[in-house]
Amino acid sequence: MSLTKAERTMVVSIWGKISMQADAVGTEALQRLFSSYPQTKTYFPHFDLHEGSPQLRAHGSKVAAAVGDAVKSIDNVAGALAKLSELHAYILRVDPVNFKFLSHCLLVTLASRLPADFTADAHAAWDKFLSIVSSVLTEKYR
């Protein structure tokens, strides 16, 4: 699966509009993840998962940084996220379905923060992009 030029442009444009709030976006997406899919909390037994906790904000920043890296390297997402893929597959052993859950939460967060810009086409482009990101993050499982 690959993005068309128009889809790449939409993904980069949306990220450009949200990048100044990227850490908050990552944190909000994680909060949505833990609220909607409470089973994902098992990967963070040592975290204070209450809204606004320093640990939640720190990990939200990491999520946002990874998405930002993928956007910056939109033509080579696999290269940009190779180390993160290995970490999640071999060390953290995160169930691959959780990346799809997080992708959904990121879509909802982007839509809620950019209602005028997150059109149906932008949603479709971001959904496809996050599917690529999820695929890259789970490719080491095979």
UniProtKB/Swiss-Prot annotation:
What GO MF annotations does this protein's record show? heme binding; iron ion binding; oxygen binding; oxygen carrier activity
List the GO biological process terms.
cellular oxidant detoxification; erythrocyte maturation; hydrogen peroxide catabolic process; negative regulation of transcription by RNA polymerase II
Q: Which residues carry this modification: Phosphoserine?
A: S53, S73
User: Which amino acids does the record list as binding heme b?
Assistant: H59, H88
Instruction: List cellular component terms (GO).
Output: haptoglobin-hemoglobin complex; hemoglobin complex
Sequence intervals crossing the membrane: none
- The chain residues annotated with the modification N-acetylserine are S2
**Residue ranges constituting the Globin domain according to the UniProt record:** 2-142
- Similarity field: Belongs to the globin family.
Give the protein name, as stated in the record.
Hemoglobin subunit zeta
Classification lineage: Eukaryota, Metazoa, Chordata, Craniata, Vertebrata
Q: Which gene encodes it?
A: HBZ1
